[in-house]
Amino acid sequence: MFYVVRSGCAWRLLPSDFGPWQTVYGCFRRWSQDWTWTFIHDTLRDYVRKTEERKVAPTAAIIDSQSVKVPDQAGERGYDAGKKVSGRKRHLAVDCLGLILAIMITPAAVQDRDAAKGLIKVLVSLYGRLQVIWADGGYLGALVQWVKQLRPFGKLRLEIVRRCDQTKGFKVLPKRWIVERTFGWLYKSRRLRSDYEVRLDHSEAMIRICMIRLMLKRLAKAS
């Protein structure tokens, strides 16, 4: 699995040393459907947080999206007019270490604010200690008030990290750089430079496999 994600090779081109490609793909598909990849990913994330002397349940998250191209043979897609990309969007929520808390894959035409509601609902259901979510200006508007209503008697807020209108070129923004770094980690895996998967759940699984590999390397260095 790591070889496919890191090298970007097609399943049928998997070296014979790894066994029949049908067997490997069958395992990947089965683990995608029964949430095994999610379980492994989340377990490793908890271990990494502990090694960094963090509590398992985060109190803060950062959300953002990334539009990626989809080859002609792949499935569902849309057109992101802002980025001028025909493909899909990866919506991520990460903790302050850049580790993924939640993933959502949509056609690229879906607005960030619309997808964010589903992503934030997942965060709220999984992480009861969550207090603040940081996002960029693309999430500004009614979403801020909507987040407050999710926990009317609790402390949960959406904070928009604004970019100065007078700033030209690239500038590192507080908090937002964390999720951008996570997207950079994903880009190092050739399989994730575009979205080659027909099924959306397979797209999510590929992202989790990439992060599993990175977290295993991180834990190995810490041991």
Residue ranges and their predicted role:
Residues M1-S223:
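Short alpha-helical elements
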